[in-house]
Each structure stands twice: as C-alpha cells, then as structure tokens.
From Swiss-Prot:
Residues 171-758 form the TBDR beta-barrel domain. One of its GO terms (cellular component) is cell outer membrane. It comes from Neisseria meningitidis serogroup B (strain ATCC BAA-335 / MC58). It holds the Pfam family TonB_dep_Rec_b-barrel. Keywords: Cell outer membrane, Membrane, Receptor, Signal, TonB box, Transmembrane, Transmembrane beta strand, Transport. Belongs to the TonB-dependent receptor family. It comes from the Bacteria. Probable receptor, TonB-dependent. This is Probable TonB-dependent receptor NMB0964. Residues 50-161 form the TBDR plug domain. Residues 1-24 form the signal peptide. It is a multi-pass membrane protein. The keyword Transferase does not apply.
Length: 758
C-alpha cells in the first residue's frame, strides 16, 4: 500500500515538539489512569454543556488513560461498565452501549458532528482521534438533548485541544507519545504542541502516525494472523485561537487518512441482484427500474423474494478471485470554528458558537481497483446561550442547523451493481434547551429538543417521464419530512456529601436515516441486501434509569438500573426465508432485508465497586448485563392461495440481534512506590445463548490484562513509561456484539510506550 503524502506532514508536526522539551518545568502532577465517575461535586467536569451537569452514571475517561488504549473508539471504551465494542478488523470499532449502537448513540467530536459514515456500516471508522484527545465523556440525561434526539443509551463526546481555549503556561505546552505492540505489530507516534504568540494568540499543531499489520489470533483455521486486519492511519491538525479575559475564538483544519483491511470480506454475491418487485410492477411502473426504493407494499413479491445470482466460484471467504485483497482507502478533511464568550449580552452569562464542515470520502478497493465509493459532506452550525439565574433556575438554550449530502455508489457499471444509496440530502433544524433548579442537596434538571428533518433524493424527472410509457401515475417524489420531539427529566439527590442518587426519565424520538428510507443494494459488511422503506415513521422510546454513586476515602461505587421501551423500533426484517425457491438454504447466506418497525424492550444493570484496604492498594469488581427483545413484530403476507387470497402470518417476539453477553470483572491497582504503579484487570465474558434469528452461540472467554507505569518529572517534562500485556492467557475472543462474531479478536499482545508532557 503506497504511503500517502500526509506522512511527512505528521512527522514534521511530531519533530517540531522535540527541541522544546528543554523549556518545560518540573511539576508534581500525577498521572490518573482510571475511569472517573462523576459523583462528587469536586470531580472532573464534562465540557459538553455550558451548565456542567451530570448524572451518577456519567463517565469521564482521562486522556492519560486513552494514550495507552486502542486508537479506535469502540476498543478504547470496551471494558467500561455497560460498554462493549463492535469490532471490524483493525480499522473500525464502534461502542455498543447498553445493547445499542449506531444511530441510537451520538458520537461527537468536541461537541460537534463527526461528519463520517460510521453509522452506515460497521466496517466504517469513526472520525475521532482518542489517542490525541483530552478526555472522552459518556453522558446521559437531559444534557444529551443539547446535541441530538434518540440518545437512549447515552452520548459520547471526544474532547480535544485542536482549538486552544486558554494561553499555555510559560508560553508553550505539549505532549509526545510513542508505543510499540506485538499483537498487531503496531508502531504509533503522536504529539501536539501549543505555542503562545504574543499576549492573546495561541498556535496549536498535532499529529498521529500509526502503522499496524494483521493481528495475531490463537487457534483459528491454522492461521497465525487474521488476514486483512491491518490498519494504517495518519492525522495532522493545525489551529489558531485568540484568547481574552472574556473568552476565545479559534479555527482549525484537520486532515486524516486511513487505509485498513476488511477481514472475512467475500465476493461470493458480487454477481447477484435482488428480486423483490413483481414483474408486472416493473413493467407498469418503469420508474422502479430506475429507483427501486420507490416500491410500495403492493409491489413486493412476497411469494418468492430473494437474490438472483450468476456463477461465481468462491468457496472460501479469504480466497479472493478478484484482483487483490479488500481494503478501505479513506480521507476526511475537517474545517472548524469554535468560540465561547462570557457576558455577551445583558441577561446572559455565556455564549457558545460551533461551526464545522467535513468532507469525507472512502473507497472500497480490491487491490488497486475501486469497487465502491462513499461520500459525505457535512455542514453543522450551533449557537448556545446560558441565561443569568432566574430565581433557582439556570438554563442553556440554543439552535442548530445540520446538512448532510451523502451517497454510496458502485464504480462498476454492471447491471447487478446496484448503488446502495443514491445522492441524497438531509437537513435538520433543531431547537433545544436545558433548565436546572438547585436546592441545598438536590438538583432537578429538564431538557427538551425539537428536531425537524427534510430528507430528499435528487431524481431525474425527465428520465422518469420518458420511461413512463403507460402513463402510470407517478409516486410522490417529494422530500420525506418529519419532526422529532424529545423530553428528559432528571433528579440528583446528594443525601450525604459523598452519595449521589440520580433518577432520569425521558421520551426520545429518532428520525429515520436516508439509509433506512432509500437504501437498495448489497451490504457485504452485514451480509445483507438492504431495501429501504420510505414509509417509516419516527422511532419512539420511553426510558428510565436509576443510578447510585458513592465516593469516600476508601470506598467508591457506581450502580445503575435502566429500561428502554421502544415503539416503531427500526430493524432489518429478513424476507427471503422460507418464502419460495429463492429462499436461503443456510443461515450464513446473504439475507434480503427490508427496514420495518416493531416494538422493542431493553433492560439491564451495570456497576462497579472499589475499595482501598491501604492508601497504596485499590481493589474492585465490575459487571454489566443487558437483555433485548423485539416485540409486536408486524405480520408478514403469506403466499397467495388458489383463490387469490393472501393471509397474513403473525411473527413471534424475538431476541434483539448482537446484544452483548453478561460480563464480570476484577481489578487491582497498586502504587508500589511514589513513581511506580501496577494494575491487573480480569474479565469473564459469558457465553451468549439468547440468540436472534440467524445468530449462532458465541462462546465465553477469560480476559487477563496486566500493566505497569513508571513516572518521573524532570526539567525536560513529565515522563510516563508504561508496559502492558493484553489477553495474557491468549484466549480465543469472540464478540457477540460484532457483525464478525465468528471471527476472533486479537490474541496475546505486549505493548511498551512512553508519553511526555511539557
């Protein structure tokens, strides 16, 4: 794979920092390598809202911890109670929170839209850089409505320093990192620097360069390493801010390029197309040949839906007959402006403005040949104002505009290469607000968000008219318009100075995506042929959470119970199962799915308890469990009888797909000296036997990780040397939450690295 021109840029950013290390001064700040629960009033605060509110189940993961974690967001957060990963090789991994993923979890890049297409497919990387971040915040409650609707499991905000918000001490500050890993042969360098320019300007540059090979796997098909699990990444960013006594305004430009393989990627169905529309409908409604997503219920051939395929010899998913191995070539350019100002107008305490634009593209390739390409252009603007207290009330209100233009097209002009998603445009207009009332030991908080969506496809109306030989009435080609209204209420009771009890209730509404509305094409990553449903309604959920947190001198615990009940839950309904000669004969075959809606019910528990028997030792246990069911599924039309009658067949309730198995953990951290820490983390992930249709049992596994850190402050900065061993038992690890649940994750791996702050 050819090196990109971004590599010299990244390396130059890292080298800029080296001569400046001598300017750093000694400090006594220790490195916190733990996940922080937001319980005590003096704990670190989230940066996501002007009110700095939190519930007892919120989490903050420090940047120091993230420097030693995987660079993909899902893998970096995996292990936090309630959070698992949906891994897809070495290049993509999304968080699975309380059994939810994708569009039911909002991921932000420092309060702004990520602008990627990670929600579209599990093999698409999320465009955030955890290895360069200041912290990652997992937030729940009313504050999530400041950013989007439908966040039933929470909001993940990756806070960074691309746009400086304060002047660096002594005129310069920064950080450098280097690490090597054996499991995936990873080599990673990262760094960033802030340079004061005069009294008010700050220049920031940062970069990351990562190169990794196929990762090691134990006992898998006589392979030592998983083919096509390699991943390379290069990121560079430059920002400039003006900082004054009342606030700041800054801009930044970031350029990220990824190249990573696609494991278990098969071309077996390349010569297939969907047969889902009645032949008579294709003749009478010729626009369906151009735009098959315009089909209605009466157009669907429920007697024999399925795939029609030409001959293609591919008995092994790893034995590609095409020109080369499958991989993704990705580039993301981000332009950003942030500003925050104190006392901007009479009656208001603070103003926050955030503008960002993303130009995202990736090509799916076989060797050097482009097979599919994905585009997403995002423009986002939001303004948030915090008003002065009105009695006990403090509040923050704002508006947001979001526009996305995206597509998923094929580069091959074959009839069977149906584009999965045509050029489309989505516009969101949102109004949001959060109000908070405080008493001595009790806080009541409410939030609201109203979100209007307009989703449209650009049709060639002249071509439709020309092909309409029989003057058949045309369907509505207008935009899909809907409005989501979400509300949340949370109470936080500090019944002692160390205790926090939070009760949160919400009604959330999520609008269907253009993929769910208009898709019509093969999706190899999920082994499906997707058919959109332009008649989808908004998804609704009623949610409740009870969380208890305690933080004392020796004990710390955080416990949470939750339930999410959905109406109009959007899911992919399989059509080619037992409905004619084209039906699948094996659960591993490609499914023909159409987006539909049903009820759903998710509930679970998560928690962690820590105890310090001595000032130098800390032991703890953790665990999580989630259960998900699809309920009240719509009846499917049966086969037409000899009299022309078509009965409807009721569908039984089902287990929700890809719900993580239960997990228990044991943790030990020891401060061996003032400079040396050691930690042990053991997890038991149980087998998942509660299976959705077409799923197979995922075996459980034991995970043992060890690590040690050595810290030293010198005149050259704060140094932190670390070593760690992951999956020390070399277990075969399979994740039920992944679309590749039968593909193992990385085996035993040893990592060594160093970070220095100055």
């Amino acid at each position: 794979m050819a090196q990109t021109t971004l590599k010299p840029i990244v390396l130059s950013i890292l080298l800029i920092n080296t001569p400046l290390l001598a300017q750093a001064h000694e400090t006594e700040q220790s490195v916190d390598l733990e996940t922080v629960s937001v319980v005590g009033k003096s704990r670190p605060r989230a940066t996501s809202g002007l009110l700095h509110t939190s519930t007892a189940s919120d989490k903050i993961i420090s940047g120091d911890t993230l420097r030693q974690k995987a660079v993909n967001l899902g893998d970096a957060l995996d292990g936090v109670p309630g959070i698992h990963a949906s891994q897809y090789g070495g290049g993509a991994s999304a968080p699975v929170i309380r059994g939810q993923t994708g569009r039911r979890i909002k991921v932000l890049n420092h309060h702004g839209e990520t602008g990627d297409m990670a929600d579209f497919s599990p093999d698409h990387a999320i465009m955030v850089d955890t290895a360069l971040s200041q912290q990652v915040e997992i937030l729940r409650g009313p504050v999530t409505l400041l950013y989007s609707s439908g966040n039933v499991a929470g909001l993940v905000d990756v806070a960074d320093g691309k746009i400086p918000e304060k002047m660096p001490e002594n005129g310069v500050s920064g950080e450098l990192g280097l690490r090597l890993s054996s499991g995936n042969l990873e080599k990673l360098t990262s760094g960033g620097i802030n340079i004061g320019l005069g009294k008010n300007f700050v220049l920031h540059t940062e970069g990351l360069y990562r190169k990794s090979g196929d990762y090691a796997v134990p006992r898998y098909r006589n392979l030592k390493r998983l083919p096509d699990s390699h991943a390379d990444s290069q990121t560079g960013s430059i920002g400039l801010s003006w900082v004054g006594e009342k606030g700041f305004i800054g801009v930044a430009y970031s350029d990220r390029r990824d190249q990573y393989g696609l494991p278990a990627h098969s071309h077996e169905y390349d010569d297939c197309h969907a047969d889902i529309i009645w032949q008579k409908s294709l003749i009478n409604k010729r626009y369906l040949q151009l735009y098959p997503h315009l089909l209605t219920e009466e157009d669907i051939d429920y007697d024999n839906p399925g795939l029609s395929c030409g001959f293609h010899d591919d008995d092994n998913a790893h034995a590609h007959t095409h020109s080369g191995r499958p991989w993704i070539d990705l580039r993301n350019k981000r332009y950003e402006l942030r500003a925050e100002w104190k006392q901007p107008f009479p009656g208001f305490e603070a103003l926050r403005v955030h503008l960002n634009r993303n130009d995202y593209r990736h090509d799916e390739k076989a060797g050097d040949a482009v097979e599919n390409f994905f585009n997403n252009q995002t423009q986002n603007a939001r303004i948030e104002l915090r008003h002065q207290p009105i009695g006990r009330l403090k509040g923050s209100w704002g508006v947001q505009y979001l526009q996305q233009k995206s597509s998923a097209l094929s580069a091959i002009s074959e009839a069977v290469k149906q584009p999965m998603l045509l050029d489309n445009k989505v516009q969101h207009y949102s109004f949001f607000g959060v109000e908070q009332a405080n008493w001595d030991n009790f806080t009541l908080e409410g939030g609201v968000r109203v979100e209007k969506q307009k989703a449209s496809i650009q049709y060639d109306k002249a071509l439709i008219d020309r092909e309409n030989y029989y003057n058949h009435p045309l369907p509505d080609l207008g935009a899909h318009r809907q409005t989501a209204r979400s509300f949340a209420l949370s109470g936080n009771w500090y019944f002692t100075p160390q205790h926090k009890l939070s009760l949160t209730a919400s009604h959330q509404e999520r609008l269907p995506s253009t993929q769910e509305l208009y898709a019509h094409g093969k999706h190899v990553a999920t082994n499906t042929f997707e058919v959109g449903n332009k008649h989808l309604n908004k998804e609704r959920s009623n949610n409740i959470e009870l969380a208890l947190g305690y933080e004392g001198d020796r004990w710390q615990y955080n416990l949470a119970l939750y339930r999410n009940r959905f109406g109009n839950y959007i899911y992919a309904q399989t059509l080619n199962d037992g409905r004619g000669p084209k039906s699948i004969e094996d659960d591993s075959e490609m499914k023909l799915v159409r987006y539909n809606q049903s009820g759903a019910d998710f509930y679970g528990a998560e928690g962690e308890i820590y105890f310090k028997p001595t000032p130098r030792y800390r032991i703890g246990v953790s665990g999580d469990y989630v259960r998900g069911r699809l309920k009240n599924l719509p009846s499917l039309p049966g086969r037409e009888d000899a009299y022309g009658n078509r009965p409807f067949i009721a569908q039984d309730d089902q287990n929700a797909p890809r719900v993580p198995a239960a997990r228990l953990g044991f943790h030990l951290k020891a401060s061996l000296t003032d400079r040396i820490d050691a930690n042990l983390d053991y997890y038991r992930v149980f087998a998942q036997n509660k299976l959705a249709r077409y799923e197979t049992r995922t075996p459980g596994h034991h995970m043992l990780n060890l690590g040690a850190n050595y810290r030293r402050n010198t005149r050259y900065g704060e140094w932190n040397w670390y070593v760690k061993a992951d999956n020390l038992l070399n277990q075969s690890v399979y994740a039920h939450s992944s679309f590749l649940s039968d593909t193992p994750q990385m085996g035993r791996s040893f990592t060594g690295g160093v970070n220095v702050k100055f």
